[in-house]
Amino acid sequence: MSTAKDPGNGVYEILSLIFDFPSNEQRLWWHSTAPMFAAMLDNAGYSVHDQYRHLSIFKTHIIPFLGVYPTKGQERWLSILTRCGLPLELSLNCTDSVVRYAYEPINEMTGTEKDPSNTLPIIGSVQKLAQIQAGIDLEWFSYFKDELTLDESESAILQDTELVKEQIKTQNKLALDLKESQFALKVYFYPHLKSIATGNSTHFLIFDSVFKLSQKHDSIQPAFQALCDYVSRRNDSSEVDQHRALHARLLSCDLIDPAKSRVKIYLQEQTVSLPAMEDLWTLGGRRVDASTMDGLDMLRELWSLLKVPTGHLEYPKGYMELGEIPNEQLPSLVNYTLHRNDPMPEPQVYFTVFGMNDAEISNALTIFLQRHGFADMAKKYRVFLQDSYPYHDFESLNYLHSLVSFSYRRNKPYLSVYLHTFETGRWPVVADSPISFDAYRRCDLSTK
């Protein structure tokens, strides 16, 4: 059994004594996820005041939008955010020590006749966050929501014709980047259902929505055109090799003044290999400036350390069962940021490490961080992750890391990890709490 200290350095424990919860569902969500959240804030160097603020926001404004607490066999809304349909995921920028989390807003109407495709809760969630954080602007939120998610008539068409028989129905999610005491809000759109309803591909819907936006905000046109040219060349060559095709999967933007907001287009790469990563990074050889090549050297180093298996892969159509141990590998992912008045889009590549050994991934990341001047995070990272799941056999786990992302700008690497966030810390902390991921637990907690 782990002898690690309680995650959160006391902030989680103190708030747990203070908080009242309107339902047992929200109480379970708090005790399942807040220990890891608190520990991440502490390890990333947030002041104790900022830790209290962000955890309080999480309890008050986020947990009410997470829906029923997931247990095996219980009917619930499944979110594309994680492979087992959990609607919440913590992430950590290891090089900037910035904590983030993403969630798909859910409420009691989600999945019912009143809102079969979960279109509405995100509106209420955004409005609540806009009341407590200055600078949130909803212009681009409204634009992309109209362009990429179902309207009422389209939703009715899908239900009446039973066109939607697949499990994956997520249309949008929100993410908060926590910056000292404040947060920056981002939105992500998945137009898969819109594609089924309209007959237009997800790829077309995403690129068409950005094209129309660029007619009004022409400063993003150079980068957008460069991306279009690259994707067109790749997809034309897919007639010879089908695995070379790039498919747009989702889009995100910052919910701030449109004059400052960034648009990011996410593409799925079916070929998992170093040459494929290099092609994504350089836009097929079009980005060859000194900074790009410095970043490419680090990308190659990270690839070597992580030892991601190669192959031609497709994304699964359904979800894993809650508590199921993964035996799969996923395609790679890349996003391109369209900066204003920049002739080239900026890449961020994602290593899909879900299903790989978490101890080995932690060791690889530690080495990378040590080599590049992030000794403090290198020292803390593995300990933090082990302490977040103290009753598990850490050496055997293979589902804590879902993604490792990498970008390079202003002459430094940006490395982030996306982490399984469920039943963390000393779970269960309340009697008769469910235990879902128990395959690698070190002890029987039934008497504790």
Curated annotation (Swiss-Prot):
Domain of life: Eukaryota
Pathway(s) it belongs to: Alkaloid biosynthesis; ergot alkaloid biosynthesis
Keyword Transcription regulation applies: no
Sequence positions that bind L-tryptophan: 80-81, 89, 190, 249
Entry keyword set: Alkaloid metabolism, Transferase
Transferase is among the record's keywords: yes
Gene Ontology biological process terms from the UniProt entry: ergot alkaloid biosynthetic process
Gene Ontology MF terms: tryptophan dimethylallyltransferase activity
Amino-acid positions noted as binding substrate in the UniProt annotation, renumbered to this chain: 100, 186, 188, 262, 264, 266, 348, 350, 414, 418
The protein's enzyme class: transferase
InterPro entries from the UniProt entry: Aro_prenylTrfase, Aro_prenylTrfase_DMATS, DMATS-type_fun, Trp_dimethylallylTrfase
Reaction catalyzed: L-tryptophan + dimethylallyl diphosphate = 4-(3-methylbut-2-enyl)-L-tryptophan + diphosphate
EC number of the protein: 2.5.1.34
Function: Catalyzes the first step of ergot alkaloid biosynthesis. Ergot alkaloids, which are produced by endophyte fungi, can enhance plant host fitness, but also cause livestock toxicosis to host plants.
Family: Belongs to the tryptophan dimethylallyltransferase family.
Complexes and interactors: Homodimer.
Name assigned to this protein: Tryptophan dimethylallyltransferase 2
Organism per entry: Claviceps purpurea (strain 20.1)
Gene encoding the protein: dmaW2
